[in-house]
Amino acid sequence: MLQITDKSQCCGCHACVSVCARQCITMQEDNEGFLYPVVDASTCMDCGLCEKVCPVINQDAPRKPLKVYAAKNRNEEVRRQSSSGGIFTPLAEAVIRDGGVVFGAKFDKEWNVIHAWTDTIEGIADFRGSKYVQSTIGNTYREAREFLKQGRKVLFSGTPCQIAGLRKFLRKEYGNLLAVDVVCHGVPSPLVWRKYLEETREKLRAERDAGKNTVSSTLMEMPVITGISFRDKTHGWKKSGFRLRYAAFKAAGNSVSSSANDSERTLLQPFPENVFMKGFLSNFYLRPSCYACTARTGKSGSDISIADFWGVQNYYPEFDDDKGIGLVLVNSEKGRKAYEQTNSDSIESTYEQGLNQNPCLEALVYLS
């Protein structure tokens, strides 16, 4: 029976929950906002499957990539909307055009980060761009398995530990699965993210109401978030900032109507000035397992890994236009074929060049 006594030994991937046929494992949030599996001993048969699919207990060997590229999407608008080079999009589009399904992280209506799937080109946009919050996998491992069994191509994207969890959950190789992980700094607490959004809404409301007369306690302007980007490129890729778009609405009773004087507004902050990003980059509220990550150094089993190619200007200055350059690690023959089909603008590089200013490929994070 799976028992979590050391929280650094659970990455929250949901593999154990997903594999349990008796559904006696649930994910429950702790006081830091992270989900951990809890087993109902009264219904558990002690079959051991949950332990067999745990990527922390059953780690793969480290791997070096077959090929490494500096890459960028030829579509400037797609690259603008992406965190780095926009390489995820053509990979996903190719799968969908072949009748497949793409899984990735998106915002829900409350701006929580969840994993979901799409089989439309339009749906890919929701997965585009980094989300610096641990996403909830939910039932997506099982959904991916069903699509794979049907013979449909599946692209599953996520953090290295989520990809490792998926592969352990599947317990067999599928030729129609393309696993893509994003090189990860660590995943912040969803609870901290929710608190940040609550405090930001309150701050925006207070600033807006300053100096105004409140007619009624039931009639007030409330900021409604309409868009979030953790990596806005308004001032360039190397000076990415946090952007939050919002609009003010008047709420009276149960009715909500747009104020005629309201227009969408933007909060754009450099990372050092945004309290959430500052804490994230200082490693203050990452999941405990991130400080002891077992999925780095190519151990996730992904076919392709994607990251920012920081320092690309030192090697290929003519290729760097400060609009975003991706670091693409091709980890398998399947990944090589998939990447070649993207027709991306790319230069073959080396692992050492990519690693030079991207230590998260190998190094653990520590509290600053």
Model-derived features with residue positions:
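Short, intrinsically disordered, charge-biased short linear motifs at domain edges
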Residues: 1, 5-7, 38-42, 272-281
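Iron-sulfur cluster-binding cysteine motifs and their immediate structural context
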Residues: 2-4, 15-38, 48-66, 303-304
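Short cysteine clusters
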Residues: 10-16, 20, 44-50, 54, ...
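Acidic/polar N-terminal loop/beta-strand segments that form early-domain functional surfaces
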Residues: 30, 42, 105-107
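Glycine-rich loop at the start of a catalytic domain that most often binds anionic cofactors/ligands
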Residues: 41, 47, 117-118
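Iron-sulfur-associated redox domains of electron-transfer enzymes in respiratory
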Residues: 55, 61-368
